[in-house]
Amino acid sequence: MAKLLSKLEETFDFDEDDSIEEYLKGSFHGILDFSQEDISIIRVAMQEINGESDKKLLISRVTDTIINKMEEFFKLQLEKGEIKNVNSKAISVMCFSIIFQSTILWQIYGNSADIDSDIFADDYLDIIFNGIKP
């Protein structure tokens, strides 16, 4: 578990000079490159949700690691004036959700996905930066 958390920390780590595009694309592709063993641990952690709630769930440790790193990144972007004044926690949770769900879909569809992961990442970033309204 410590190895997985360390790998997540590394995947979502950033340099102060990273652009938002570089960071989100790098994080997305970093997760897609996780081994089957890593994904299996996350899968087990997700099954744990229905279990006991009196202990810190494994999935909470996974999500907290990712969301905290992303929130730190977005707070820096706010300070630098790179993004408008938005709730850094909200944008972190939203981006985490998209990356996490995409990872699950890529695991399900594997090489049979009807879209290239680079194109998907570009489209995802386009929606974040430009929205869906005309």
Per-range role (PLM):
Residues 73, 127-134:
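C-terminal alpha-helix
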